[in-house]
Amino acid sequence: MGKVYVFDHPLIQHKLTYIRDKNTGTKEFRELVDEVATLMAFEITRDLPLEEVEIETPVSKARAKVIAGKKLGVIPILRAGIGMVDGILKLIPAAKVGHIGLYRDPQTLKPVEYYVKLPSDVEERDFIIVDPMLATGGSAVAAIDALKKRGAKSIKFMCLIAAPGRVKAVETAHPDVDIYIAALDERLNDHGYIVPGLGDAGDRLFGTK
């Protein structure tokens, strides 16, 4: 059964405040998203299995622990999810990176899949799907659907900000997926944006409107 984790780490909350601030410029916004992604990745990888190996320090031989050969994959939902990838790869540089392209139909607010590119060994990998926002929940559900349809067995979802009621929608659709969130906000407005949120994450990351 999947779980929902909301991070209350002071560094994450501090940086998230400046990510939200409308006066934060594109360069600083990118850097902050990258930093928060790294901090969240530290927590999300807490359950990685370890195995013992023998090494030799400058002083003596010793038994030490390393990650037990786990294959990981990071899957950003285009385009805003790209801003979180490098922060995660700083901690797990051997992870493969795939991409899922979804856009939200402005009329129906439902996701439309337009691009999927994944590592060839999908069934063997533990995947982390990343997207700064979990608003309606439609994109998260569609991205998880896309991975499962192609054989993925182990999936986690990670976002910066989520709307409370919509987290439940993802849980209901995919009860086996753990969800990791930096902040739960108040609600969605009539246009499907999270309030207070941070605006359009893609536009703020890439300097577009």
From Swiss-Prot:
Pathway: Pyrimidine metabolism; UMP biosynthesis via salvage pathway; UMP from uracil: step 1/1
Comment on bound cofactor: Binds 1 Mg(2+) ion per subunit. The magnesium is bound as Mg-PRPP.
Coiled-coil zones: none
Family: Belongs to the UPRTase family.
Keywords: Allosteric enzyme, Glycosyltransferase, GTP-binding, Magnesium, Nucleotide-binding, Transferase
Record's protein name: Uracil phosphoribosyltransferase
Self-association state and partner proteins as the record states: Homodimer.
Encoding gene per record: upp
Catalytic activities: UMP + diphosphate = 5-phospho-alpha-D-ribose 1-diphosphate + uracil
UniProt GO MF annotations: GTP binding; magnesium ion binding; uracil phosphoribosyltransferase activity
Cofactors (names): Mg(2+)
Binding site for uracil: 194, 199-201
InterPro entries according to UniProt: PRibTrfase_dom, PRTase-like, Upp_B, UPRTase/APRTase, Ura_phspho_trans
Record comment: activity regulation: Allosterically activated by GTP.
Organism superkingdom: Bacteria
A Pfam family recorded for this sequence: UPRTase
Top-rank EC class of the record's enzyme: transferase
Keyword Signal attributed: no
BP term (GO), one: UMP salvage
Function recorded in the entry: Catalyzes the conversion of uracil and 5-phospho-alpha-D-ribose 1-diphosphate (PRPP) to UMP and diphosphate.
Annotated residues for binding of 5-phospho-alpha-D-ribose 1-diphosphate: 79, 104, 131-139, 200
